[in-house]
UniProtKB/Swiss-Prot annotation:
Entry's family note: Belongs to the RxLR effector family.
Biased segments, Low complexity type: 148-161
Compartmental location: Secreted; Host cell
Function: Secreted effector that completely suppresses the host cell death induced by cell death-inducing proteins.
Keyword set includes Signal: yes
Source organism of this protein record: Plasmopara viticola (Downy mildew of grapevine)
GO cellular component: extracellular region; host cell
Region (Disordered): 120-257
The name this protein goes by in its record: Secreted RxLR effector protein 32
Basic and acidic residues composition-biased segments: 212-224
Keywords linked to the UniProt accession: Secreted, Signal, Virulence
Amino acid sequence: MRGAYYVAFALLVAASTRTAAEPDQAEPHIAPNNDYMTSGGAFNKMLPRRILRESPDPKDRLPVYASDEERMVNRLSNGNSIAKGLERTIMKAANVLRTNGEDVIANAAKPIKNYNRLRPKLEIKKSKRQRIEPTLSKSSEHKLHTTSNSKKSLVSSASAKGQGRDEPRATVNTAKKMQHNHRSAPSRSSPTSADVSDGRLEKQLNAQKAINLDKNKRPDEAKIRNKKQHVIDPTPKNENGQALRAPPTPESLGIGGKQCTVRIGREK
C-alpha cells in the first residue's frame, strides 16, 4: 500500500515540474480517471492531470476534462445541429411571412381601389348633410322658442284664471274666519240662559262701540245714512216697485163736496 502512495506522489511531482517548465500553458484541470482502494475500505481518487492549451478563439475556451472529452465534443456537435435547425426554421417562417404579406397586400389592393373610386361620392354626401343639419337645428331652435313662449302665456293665463277663481274663495274664507272669531268659545258645561244673555249684551255693546267709532270717524256719512233711513217715500208702490196713481178727487172732477156725499149715500 505504501508503494501506491509513493507512485501517486511521484506523479504529482512530475506534473508540477511540467507546469513550471511551460509558462504558456493554462492552469491544470483535474479529471478523475482511476480509482484505488485504501486499507480503510474507502475509495481514494487518484486524479492524473492533463494540461490543455487555450486557443485564441473565445468559443473554444471551455474546461475539458480527461474523462469528459468525448461528451463535450458530442455536445458541441449537437449544439451546432440545433443552431442549424433554428436557422432553418427561422428562414422558413420568414419565407411564409413574406408570401403571406404579399397575399395580404394583394387582397387589400382591391378595397383600396374601390374606396378611392367612391371617395368623391362620399364627400358630396357629407357636404349635403352639413348643409341640411344647420337648417334643421335652426328650425328646431325656433320651435323650441315658440313652444316656450306659448307655454309661458298658457301658464300666465292659467295663473290669472286661478287668481280670479280664488278671490271669491278668499273672501268667503275671511268671512268665515271673522264669524268664527266673533263667536264665543264653547264652555265645558252646558250654557245657561244667564250666559246666553251675557253674550248677547256683549255683542250689542261691541256693535254699539263700533257704530260710535264709525260715527266719530265719518260723521257726515253716518248722518246721511240716518236721514235716508228716516225718509219715507210718500207715493205708494205696488209689489213690483211701481208707483201707484192716486184716486181722482171731486175737486179735480169739478163736483162739489155735498153732491159727492149725496151720491155716495144713494149708492149705499
